[in-house]
């Protein structure tokens, strides 16, 4: 987790963004934003969690290879049920959600749970918040030269713990981000796209159980012929064909429509 390059996600190639192993210096931030803002295998065995730190503020050191120890502070958003060693974390000053096995990763040192709790805020427009979930959006960011950069993506869900934030992913960079999207919408920087082209959800019989890929191992063949493996860790309720994937060689959380790609 070294200092980020300071590039917008679009400056990362799609090979880096979705299909190649990403080293620690790829932890990134949308610094241009002026606001605060496959084949499926059997399930992987899970280990038991040590303690419940979801909702806590944490800090820890991070050392990779021969590099110096850097200090990181953030909020634990979730503990992954199919792999309780894995936590989803929003680090201060970064817009991506990261997945780390905090108690097992040897690169993590001096993990400390901070006494300060996450402040809860009343959401300003509950109807708008519900309306945008599952919708395609155009999200505007201001670049260093003052011009606007448009990113098309999908609002996936309200983020856990930090209740005024939303999970979102982008077509050009299919990893999990989180922003305070209601603020961006009211300031004209987020536009909800018409959903007339979306296909209607399939009809289900009463009591029908839809198969889920959560907990399954996945394998992805890269362009160079090598393979990367990972686990499906979450199914998006608003778009059941969309899943979160945590690859073994990366700490970003990837977002893929596995029905379209299977």
Swiss-Prot record:
Annotated spans, Disordered: 1-51
Region annotation (Tudor-like domain 1) ranges: 53-116
Subunit structure and binding partners: Homodimer; may form higher-order oligomers. Interacts with TCF7L2/TCF4; the interaction is direct. Interacts with HABP4 and SERBP1. Interacts with SPINDOC; SPINDOC stabilizes SPIN1 and enhances its association with bivalent H3K4me3K9me3 mark. Interacts with SPOCD1; promoting recruitment of PIWIL4 and SPOCD1 to transposons.
Principal localisation: nucleus
Effect of residue 98 to A: Decreased binding to histone H3 trimethylated at both 'Lys-4' and 'Lys-9' (H3K4me3K9me3)
GO function term, MF aspect, one: histone reader activity
Post-translational modifications reported in the UniProt record: Phosphorylated during oocyte meiotic maturation.
Family: Belongs to the SPIN/STSY family.
Residue positions where Phosphoserine is found in the record: 109, 124, 199
Crosslink position(s): Glycyl lysine isopeptide (Lys-Gly) (interchain with G-Cter in SUMO2): 7, 28, 44
UniProt keyword rRNA-binding present: no
Source organism (scientific name): Homo sapiens (Human)
Annotated segments matching region Tudor-like domain 2: 132-193
Tissues where this protein is expressed: Highly expressed in ovarian cancer tissues.
Tudor-like domain 3: annotated span: 213-262
Site residues (Histone H3K4me3 and H3R8me2a binding), renumbered to this chain: 173, 180, 184
Protein's GO biological process: gamete generation; meiotic cell cycle; positive regulation of DNA-templated transcription; positive regulation of Wnt signaling pathway; protein localization to chromatin; regulation of DNA-templated transcription; rRNA transcription; transposable element silencing by piRNA-mediated DNA methylation
UniProt cross-references to InterPro entries, sorted A to Z: SPIN/Ssty (IPR003671), SPIN/Ssty_sf (IPR042567)
Signal peptide: none
Effect in UniProt of substituting residue 184 to A/R: Impaired binding to histone H3K4me3 and H3R8me2a
Protein name in the entry: Spindlin-1
Modified residues (N6-acetyllysine): 44
Cellular compartments per GO CC: chromatin; cytosol; nuclear membrane; nucleolus; nucleoplasm; nucleus; spindle
Location in the cell: Nucleus; Nucleus, Nucleolus
Annotated effect of mutating residue 91 to A: Decreased binding to histone H3 trimethylated at both 'Lys-4' and 'Lys-9' (H3K4me3K9me3)
